[in-house]
Amino acid sequence: MLHIKNLHKSYGAFEVLRGLEMNVNTSDIYGFLGKNGCGKTTTMNIVSNIIPKDSGEINFGKENCKIGYLPETPSMFTYMNGYEYLDYIASCCSYKDDKKKRIDEVINIVGMAEGGKRRIKGYSRGMNQRLGIAAAIFDHPDLLILDEPTSALDPQGRAEVMSIIKNLSLIHI
């Protein structure tokens, strides 16, 4: 599904990625491990087309690959509730199917049926991550990229978010 070959990226004289090669198959869960500044987020941003690569090849195995992306610190409109936020996401991606039905589906997938009606301003970090994942999967992406989805979560929150991610890989989003 995702094939990266000889990927390079530098910031001035600082070479972050030097010939990265990797293959990710459908339903696989991959994680990047490494110290700060080694290129983990840069790689995700290049694959997500947020920043350009210097050189190399990225092949998704199909044209028009949809990517769902959750940054390390998701930006959300705190004056909205979860349902309103996902309605906004649906508008951004020009979602054409039954929007309300899909909002209910993703809210349930991430286990937020009750919390979706509360204002985002009152969400815990774990609830923010769940809503961010719901937004990332909203338009049925072919590839889901999550940048540190469990950082700053307590052990229970980490386990819950990892369970959601594992289940998403099983249902192919």
Show where each model-derived region lies.
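Conserved small/polar residues in nucleotide/adenosyl-binding loops
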Residues: 171-173
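Catalytic Walker B motif of ABC-type/P-loop ATPase nucleotide-binding domains
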Residues: 144-148
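Helix-to-loop junction immediately C-terminal to a conserved catalytic motif
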Residues: 48
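Conserved ABC transporter NBD signature motif
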Residues: 52-66
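Conserved ABC ATPase "signature" region
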Residues: 87, 91-94, 98-115
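Helix N-cap at the start of a conserved alpha-helix in ABC-type nucleotide-binding domains
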Residues: 155-157
